[in-house]
Amino acid sequence: MSKQYEAAGVSLTAGYESVSRMKKHVARSMRKEVMTGLGSFGAMFDLSQLNLKEPVLVSGTDGVGTKLKLAFALDQHDTIGIDCVAMCVNDIIVQGAEPLYFLDYIALGKAIPAKIERIVAGVAEGCVQSGCTLIGGETAEMPGMYADGEYDIAGFAVGAVEKQKLITGEHVQPGDVILGLASSGVHSNGFSLVRKIVAESGLRYEDELMMFGSTIGNTLLMPTRIYVEAVKAALETEKIQAMVHITGGGFYENVPRVLPEGCGATFDPKKWPTLPVFDWLEQAGNVPRHDMYNVFNMGIGYMMIVKPEDVAAVSARLARENETVYTIGTVTSEPGVRILGVDQ
């Protein structure tokens, strides 16, 4: 059976070797609440050990989009798993949920154990950074479905929060202050546009740009920041009204998701430093300024909304985590998002 299966393009041997290689990486992320080992039909997590009186589970799923194309082009697969974890855990921490466990799904045309190990090592690193465990996953070898050397990756995160401590944004009011935490770069959104700009520029991912201090490829592949530890610290103040993870849709689409009806937001781009990568993308691609804020994070990957009198306390707590906080905007009584110097 295995010989016939292998002749059809599926290698059970490669699959077994891949699992064996990833075990040491998965072990790095283990939490004490995990009740099953790698390979169980279902992964089990003992929620009772969290000692939550009214636990609410919060879940999120995502992938990394066409950023994968850069990983393929450069044969760099060590950090793409961090991106996958980040996209999920940064979403669920928005509502105050501590990430507990993560499952990944990797689909590819041909199983190459060494490559799969590199991908999963990145996933495990993302889990370590966010304090959750890589509790399970699936690696699917599907011949004929993907081009040689290509794959897709997606993930699913589950977190928990005490019901009374859910962050819902329902008490946000005009006059509240919006704090911003820096991004590491483009993160994992907008890469279809990024790839188009690079292709039309005549440059290669291997080319170095002085303004980047690195190659174009390395700058663009910089993994998405995981904000879990910083957010958990800020939540200790019990002063957070709402939070925003800036992903696809940039400022214009993501900020309104957490604002009550009748509220909007105004941002002043002069209040935080612009990353060189966004300056280059805007200039090289001749991208309108409004579109930049509608596609990219523009240097701010995460936002927190607080009362004016709580800015100092929240900023001080984040500073203890070596986090630089920018006061980037305010909540307004005019619905929608307005960016000074962009929206007139």
Swiss-Prot record:
Subcellular localization, as worded in the UniProt entry: Cytoplasm
GO terms of molecular function: ATP binding; phosphoribosylamine-glycine ligase activity; phosphoribosylformylglycinamidine cyclo-ligase activity
Sorted UniProt keywords: ATP-binding, Cytoplasm, Ligase, Nucleotide-binding, Purine biosynthesis
A GO term from the CC aspect: cytosol
Keyword Amino-acid biosynthesis among record annotations: no
One Pfam family matching this protein: AIRS
Catalytic reactions of this protein: 2-formamido-N(1)-(5-O-phospho-beta-D-ribosyl)acetamidine + ATP = 5-amino-1-(5-phospho-beta-D-ribosyl)imidazole + ADP + phosphate + H(+)
One of the GO biological process terms: adenine biosynthetic process
Annotated metabolic or biological route of this protein: Purine metabolism; IMP biosynthesis via de novo pathway; 5-amino-1-(5-phospho-D-ribosyl)imidazole from N(2)-formyl-N(1)-(5-phospho-D-ribosyl)glycinamide: step 2/2
EC number annotated for this UniProt entry: 6.3.3.1
HAMAP family the record matches: AIRS
Family: Belongs to the AIR synthase family.
UniProt name for this protein: Phosphoribosylformylglycinamidine cyclo-ligase
Record organism: Exiguobacterium sibiricum (strain DSM 17290 / CCUG 55495 / CIP 109462 / JCM 13490 / 255-15)
